[in-house]
Amino acid sequence: MYETYHSGWIECITGSMFSGKSEELIRRLRRGIYAKQKVVVFKPAIDDRYHKEKVVSHNGNAIEAINISKASEIMTHDLTNVDVIGIDEVQFFDDEIVSIVEKLSADGHRVIVAGLDMDFRGEPFEPMPKLMAVSEQVTKLQAVCAVCGSSSSRTQRLINGKPAKIDDPIILVGANESYEPRCRAHHIVAPSDNNKEEL
């Protein structure tokens, strides 16, 4: 799993919220630092739940990060002597992130991306499916269902304690007050108000 490579490659860490994606990203990046590799970390500006200039896991572990508004900003940084590039919450970037990550790996960097594979509706969360496809290694983590305690692969969005509607906005940054992990059986997406039958 942790072989020495002579060229760049892409690692993808994915799963539902609270599955430990950021924790695993931080762990891998710290291993790189311990191995005396130069590590640079990026995160989207939209994710300011815990800290603007750090990737922070839900249990409080953190690593310094560069806050960027769009994927193309990665290429404005001097990455010449960088060995490992980490990118957290990658689902908040547009499809341009895929070609950027491929370019970085082609240039010899080990690129580690972390993000949600499904949105709150249980549908693929772009651009993660494309990143998973071009990655040499994909790690899919699971959380624990907040309802029954079984393995959880879905993210339940709650608005005022009730399941979000299918036509609610895809991106709504939150933490445990807005989301919880759920298994397939307990994941609920409420119908649109527009779908209610007229009486």
UniProtKB/Swiss-Prot annotation:
Zn(2+) binds at residues 145, 148, 183, 186. The keyword Transmembrane does not apply. The active site is at residue 89. It is found in: Cytoplasm. Pfam families: TK. One of its GO terms (cellular component) is cytosol. One of its GO terms (biological process) is thymidine metabolic process. It catalyses: thymidine + ATP = dTMP + ADP + H(+). Keywords: ATP-binding, Cytoplasm, DNA synthesis, Kinase, Metal-binding, Nucleotide-binding, Transferase, Zinc. ATP binds at residues 15-22, 88-91. Its EC number is 2.7.1.21. One of its GO terms (molecular function) is ATP binding. It comes from the Bacteria. Gene3D superfamilies: 3.30.60.20, P-loop containing nucleotide triphosphate hydrolases. Homotetramer. Belongs to the thymidine kinase family. This is Thymidine kinase. The gene is tdk.
